[in-house]
Structures are given as structure tokens and as C-alpha cells.
Swiss-Prot record:
CDD domains: KOW_RPL26. GO terms for cellular component: ribonucleoprotein complex; ribosome. Belongs to the universal ribosomal protein uL24 family. This is Large ribosomal subunit protein uL24. GO terms for molecular function: rRNA binding; structural constituent of ribosome. Keywords: Ribonucleoprotein, Ribosomal protein, RNA-binding, rRNA-binding. The keyword Ribonucleoprotein applies. The gene is rplX. PROSITE patterns: RIBOSOMAL_L24. Pfam families: KOW, ribosomal_L24. It comes from Halalkalibacterium halodurans (strain ATCC BAA-125 / DSM 18197 / FERM 7344 / JCM 9153 / C-125). One of two assembly initiator proteins, it binds directly to the 5'-end of the 23S rRNA, where it nucleates assembly of the 50S subunit. Part of the 50S ribosomal subunit.
Length: 103
């Protein structure tokens, strides 16, 4: 996958197109990511120990990884991802600026 947990990404398609957020979780087997504040859905929860009231909760749902692009740290714009080997390690680079995306 071209994005990781903690990356700042921009949604490029779907109902939340244009929104930015941080990746909270990544699901590589399903090719999906959970982005903060994006794809909010209503979940009907039964009363439980943690939530004795129950009711309808708003929460984020995962979106497909092809619908997000990482934000270039240099320009602040969405960019595609390239890979380069530096010091024997494979690192992700921003195609627009050549800046390293991995911290």
C-alpha cells in the first residue's frame, strides 16, 4: 500500500472528495484505510456495559486506499508515491517534489 498509519492524506474521489485527514488505521488485506473525519456513518448500538444508553453513534468507516493520496510535506498538495533505496532501505518519496515521505 502507498500509505501508512499516521500519514496525512487527501480524499480524491467519493462523497468526501476534497477532505483531508490523518490515517488512523490501515487494513492491507482489504486495501482499505480509516481516515480521521472522513466517511462518517451512523452505527446502531445496543445498550452495553460501555454504552448503557445504546442508540445511534457517528463513526468513521474505512475507505478504499485508491481513493486517497498522501500530502506532499514540501508543497502541501496531494502527490503520487514513488520508491527509492536509501542506505539499503526502501523509502517512499513524493513524485511532485522528490521529498521523502517516511519519517
Amino acid at each position: 500500500m502507498h500509505v501508512k498509519k499516521g500519514d496525512t492524506v487527501k480524499v480524491i474521489s467519493g462523497k468526501d472528495k476534497g477532505k483531508q485527514g490523518v490515517i488512523l488505521e490501515a487494513y492491507p488485506k482489504k486495501d482499505r484505510v480509516l481516515v480521521e473525519g472522513v466517511n462518517i456513518v451512523k452505527k446502531h448500538a445496543k445498550p452495553s456495559q460501555e454504552n448503557p444508553q445504546g442508540g445511534i453513534l457517528n463513526m468513521e468507516a474505512p475507505i478504499h486506499v485508491s481513493n486517497v493520496l498522501p500530502i506532499d510535506p514540501k508543497t502541501g498538495e496531494p502527490t503520487r508515491v514513488g520508491y527509492k533505496v536509501e542506505n539499503g532501505k526502501k523509502v517512499r518519496i513524493a513524485k511532485k517534489s522528490g521529498e521523502v515521505l517516511d519519517k
